[in-house]
Design a protein with these regions (language model features):
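N-terminal Sec/SRP start-transfer signal
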Residues: 1-29, 41, 46, 280, ...
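Alpha-helical transmembrane segments of integral membrane proteins
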Residues: 19-29, 290-310, 344-351, 355
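Hydrophobic, regular-secondary-structure patches
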Residues: 20, 24, 28-109, 129-135, ...
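A short beta-strand structural signal in non-transmembrane regions
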Residues: 55, 146, 201-219, 227-263
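Hydrophobic secondary-structure segments that place a key small or acidic residue at a functional site
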Residues: 91-94, 104-114, 121-227
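Peri-transmembrane interface segments
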Residues: 249-252, 257-305, 315-319, 334, ...
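Transmembrane alpha-helical interface segments in multi-pass membrane proteins
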Residues: 300, 313, 317, 321-367
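Conserved transmembrane alpha-helices of multi-pass membrane proteins
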Residues: 364-380
Length: 380
């Protein structure tokens, strides 16, 4: 029976090549559409996945990683004092305006973190290092952003808001599909970028129970003053966005989450997986782009199945007389079906292998040149 299936496939090579091209197209369509959807979903929480934090602490209004209220830096000290916390680190997120050397502007997402920290890591660093971010107005970005930012390479300078900016490092695979261009820098530099063009003042009060509460206010600076902002250390009133918590070895995370929620006012406490899931669900379920990409993946699968089914049906129909002859010679229905199934398996394998190679190559190219992840998995 195996020889009959092979003979049916290879007796007309031009027809076979056309059929396999159709199957390869259908398989590629499904793989790319589903891969884009999964890659989009993965990229939205990639920075969370790259971190080694056990727990994330954010303002209770937090919707997802980038959409949240700020907290004062004093929450960092309060978190470090909670029993079961081995280490706590802060990160800040703010928006900004990029002005390239030739005067072009673009939106930015400025992410500040502790270069000496151990939990927040931006991914693979391909040029420069985290220590370089300690220098005034130094930043890193994904290497796929160089063209859009109009930068030539390390040492290139531009302007963020009204502050100078110097490229000190490059990362790879860190740019989310749905985010503005991401700039990574130290907390101090991020503060300078976010407040450039502004003057600040701190007001503190002693509240009930003799607790000290401080707030920082900002006012627009005189535009005639073109001097760069001063890099200053953060104060307890300066805003941060998230706290990353590493638990003591053996510490139950659910118990520690409850302690942190009780010790820190107006916060939400999530594990790393919960934070990543919350962010992905927002983009997948609550935005138009998630719906459109999901719909595209579903339609791609349906179209792919229809194309493959039509090709297989056409192949069987072309050999209906041979199957009739086998039936007349006493072949059972099971034997006939085995020939058809064998033929379908050969067509699937011979169409899928080149399709997979094509999709892997395309995924590598888009990741390297555009920073767009097409996630190829065994299921796709």
């Amino acid at each position: 029976m195996v020889s009959i299936a092979r003979k049916n496939l290879f007796e007309d090579i031009p027809r076979f090549v056309v059929a396999q091209a159709g199957i390869m197209f259908a398989a590629s369509l499904v793989t790319i559409q589903v891969g884009i959807f999964h890659g989009f979903t993965r990229s939205t929480a990639q920075l969370i996945d790259n971190s080694s934090a056990d727990i994330w602490v954010s303002a209770e209004e937090m919707v997802y990683f980038e959409l949240t209220q700020s907290m004062p830096l004093e929450r960092l000290t309060e978190a470090q004092a909670v029993d079961g916390v081995q280490r706590a680190e802060a990160i800040s997120l703010s928006g900004g305006r990029w002005r390239s050397p030739d005067g072009k502007i673009a939106p930015l997402r400025i992410i500040g973190f502790d270069p000496d920290g151990t939990m927040f890591r931006v991914g693979e660093v391909v040029a420069g290092g985290f220590n370089d971010l300690k220098e005034p107005f130094a930043f890193m970005t994904d290497r796929t952003n160089l063209d859009s930012l109009r930068l030539d390479g390390l040492g290139s300078t531009a302007e963020v808001n009204s502050a100078p900016a110097r490229l000190a490092g490059l990362t790879q695979g860190t740019q989310s599909i749905v985010s503005s261009t991401m700039l990574f820098t130290s907390l101090e530099n991020a503060k300078a970028y976010a407040t450039s063009g502004l003057t600040s003042s701190v007001f503190c009060d002693v509240g009930a129970g003799d607790g000290l509460s401080c707030t920082t206010t900002y006012e627009r600076r005189d535009e005639s003053d073109e001097s760069p902002p001063e890099i200053t250390a953060l104060t307890i009133a300066d805003p941060i966005t998230h706290l990353l918590i590493r638990a003591e070895p053996g510490q139950d995370l659910e118990v520690l989450k409850e302690r942190l929620a009780n010790a820190l006012p107006d916060v939400i406490v999530l594990t790393q997986d919960e934070m990543a899931t919350r962010t992905r669900n927002y983009w997948r379920l609550r935005t138009g782009i998630g719906f459109i990409l999901g719909l595209g993946a579903a339609v791609g699968m349906i179209v792919g199945v229809v194309i493959v089914g039509q090709i297989l049906y056409s192949s069987v129909s072309d050999h209906i007389r041979e199957y009739g002859t086998l039936k007349a010679m006493g072949a059972s229905d099971r034997m006939i079906y085995s020939v058809i199934i064998e033929q379908a398996l050969w067509m699937a394998v011979l169409g899928y292998i080149p399709s997979l190679l094509l999709c892997v190559g395309l995924g590598a190219w888009t990741a390297a040149t555009q920073g767009i992840m097409i996630l190829i998995t065994p299921l796709t």
